[in-house]
Amino acid sequence: MHITITGNLGSGKSTICKILEDKYGFEIYSTGKVQRELAREMNITTLEMNQLMCSDRKYDTMIDDATARISRENRDKNIIFDSRLAWHFVEQSFKIFLSVSLNVAAERVMNDNRGKEEKYATLKEARDMLAARAATEDKRYKDMYNLNYFDFSNYNLVIDSTYHTPEKIASIIMQEAKNFETVMKEKVYEAGNQGINRILLSPKRLYNKTVEIAEAADLKDLVEEYKKVTNYLDKTIAVHKSGDEYTVINGLLEVKAAALAEVPYIPVRLD
């Protein structure tokens, strides 16, 4: 099985990939490492490297070609491609996007002691730089490949990493990947997400306010029912997405009950 994993900066991709490697026996192919090494060799930041790649395609071509070649030559191996665009270049894969709130992403990179990313003096600086890097990458992918990187419909699984442990997320990823593999045994791979597109967000990402005592009492029965849920609800909630924020269109009571019951995830549909 081939899994391609990408997502927001600070979403924990590397940590989750390491768990999938250690616990489930996947081999990691990280093109992000190649990009960081190129930036270090040129004595520039990752952001500057991304900006340079807007005008010099040889770096992108090198990464893209290597990714496609490895996937073709190792179809029978369990490989995770930790790469921004591997979902586009690997012909047959379970495509994952890790989502995380900008505030939590900024906190994570501020506290990152691995020495692989730039250091930030304040949380605001981290937020601003993460937003700038995301905008630069988004523009580059649109200009060079005509791809909308942040379009969730590109992926088979979009999963929120804001509130849950990497171990929990890795477990759900493997469950969904196995389900995908079972379905695809009866299908032929085509371009796109193969008609499989699940978006899982934490209830706290959808509603992070305190539920009033009176309302919590009214939701008691639903909360007790939801306490039995181990991974995600079997109901899909319609939401509107605007940048980093989500607004629940219908099903707000279910979201509040899920938050009170500490349900890990809610499936959502973007309207």
Report residues per predicted region.
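Hydrophobic positions on the alpha1 helix immediately C-terminal to the Walker A/P-loop
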Residues: 16, 20
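Hydrophobic anchor at the beta1->P-loop junction of P-loop NTPases
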Residues: 5
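Small-molecule kinase domains that catalyze NTP-dependent phosphoryl transfer to phosphate-bearing small molecules
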Residues: 118-169, 190-198
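P-loop (Walker A) phosphate-binding loop of NTP-binding proteins
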Residues: 8
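ATP-dependent small-molecule kinase phosphotransfer cores
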Residues: 31-90, 103-104, 115, 128, ...
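Conserved phosphate-donor/acceptor-positioning beta-strand/loop module used by diverse small-molecule
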Residues: 92-116, 120-129
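Conserved lysine of the Walker
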Residues: 13
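Short, charged/polar connector segments at secondary-structure boundaries
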Residues: 180-271
